[in-house]
Amino acid sequence: MRRVSGILAVAAFTISAFAGVIQPVAKDARDSAELDVKLTQVDGTVIKAVVTNNGDKDLNILNLNFFRDTAPVKKVSIYSQGVEVPFGGIRVRHKTSDLSSDVITYLAPGESFEDEFDVAITSDLSQGGPVVLQTQGYVPTTDTGGKTLSGVVRYKSNKLEIDVDGTTAAKSFAAMNQFVKIAKLSSCEGSQGDDTRRALRDCASLSTLAAAQAWAGGPKMLEYFKANDDATRKLVADRFTAVALESSNLTGGSTTYYCRDPYNICTNNIIAYTIPAENLISNCPIYYTEFDNVNRKCHGQDRVTTSLHEFTHASSVFSPGTKDIAYGYNACILLSTRDALNNADTFALFAQSINAGC
């Protein structure tokens, strides 16, 4: 049953980072990666990543949903006996323009930066034993001004096997669970509640249109999902239909939607986030202050498609939930069909293109 305790509760969906996801490479990817990621064990489940620019060009790397992000985002994939361990952290939607300088790292050719993180905080490793860590994918880069996403570079790591002490790892994961459970609830009253309800109603309408567009097929399916066959059109339409049904129901379902951040995760670059393991979505302050309800500019961000983006992450909406494999139009259109079907921003951009008439 959906919780409605001083918050706006919205419908649930069935679904399952850019960083940390082991995915098939994009259709035009090269075997070599511009960024080399060297993973080593520091102590227990604490891992060090050294990220090196292997290319011949200066890069401005976005750290959100990547190494150096201080939020509990996915940085590596973890495998136990060949099966990926479920991710228990957060997935965020960040801005694609007007980014602050503190989330950008400049790397000249040959230069590196480091990041240390505890993989047991965001994955339940209480079973202990050997696990394998690895990561590859695409990370956004910004223009020379460092404020707007302008491209992507590929990154790839080594495989690192570590032996996990299950008892110690369980304590780290419990800290994340406690973080979720003790947070103070925020209300959905006043103008923020009104703005959120309007966005959710419009999200339902737009998702219905997007489902119809997907069923019909055509150039837009090829543009965003690189396929136009019956099976792909059905998968896309079914996810949009699930989002439409759930976002139109403000009093039932299993996903809880917060108008205000209950966990102090938001920053001036994050629009909203989802904790898939909790089927919980929260807007951030800039959802209201920096974005309109609908953006008519092609590939733009707005409240409606931000909520849609987050809904596709929720594991109770449409199974499996989407991940954050790529952000922004330029990156999303590079993805293979398999990756696009598993990428939240691809669905958001597909739907937004309908509103914008792209």
UniProtKB/Swiss-Prot annotation:
Disulfide bonds join C188-C259, C266-C284. It catalyses: Preferential cleavage of bonds with hydrophobic residues in P1'. Also 3-Asn-|-Gln-4 and 8-Gly-|-Ser-9 bonds in insulin B chain. Residues 1-19 form the signal peptide. GO terms for molecular function: metal ion binding; metalloendopeptidase activity. GO terms for biological process: proteolysis. One of its GO terms (cellular component) is extracellular region. Binds 1 zinc ion per subunit. Its main location: secreted. Keywords: Cleavage on pair of basic residues, Disulfide bond, Glycoprotein, Hydrolase, Metal-binding, Metalloprotease, Protease, Secreted, Signal, Zinc, Zymogen. Belongs to the peptidase M35 family. PANTHER family: NEUTRAL PROTEASE 2, PTHR37016. This is Neutral protease 2 homolog PADG_00776. It comes from Paracoccidioides brasiliensis (strain Pb18). The lineage of its organism: Eukaryota, Fungi, Dikarya, Ascomycota, Pezizomycotina.
